[in-house]
Amino acid sequence: MKKFLSVIMLSATLISFAQDKAIKYNQVPKTGQQFINKHFGAKQVGSVMLDDDYFSKEYKVYLANGTKVEFDGDGAWKEVDGKRNAIPTGFIPAKISNYVKRSFPNTTITKIERDRKEIEVKLNNEIKIKFEIPSQYSEIFR
């Protein structure tokens, strides 16, 4: 019974430390700040959250227009979510941007997510497209 209670207490402690906490924008890694300044210049930062667990850090920057930008612990972007509004495309690999423009004219990218193996974009018509890294078309799904 003691072991069981110890495991429960340890789990509760770990969970409590893994929650988002509000931080200042200048605490985001410089790479992340440069990304925000370059691609979202005129939009103001609303709030910044740090998700810090024992294994990794993740920064979430919420802009005044509702856009959310997530960074890993080094400040590399992981996700940009325009919440159904178009996002800037200057940071998106050219092969992906060109494929979307050519294959889905009159649409805009509203969300992009990246991990080590793939990039997924979501368009304003709700179509999602996955690309294997490096930038090879993978699949389209609705």
Features from the language model and the residues they span:
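Bacterial Sec-dependent N-terminal signal peptides
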Residues: 1-23, 36
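Interaction-mediating elements
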Residues: 19-142
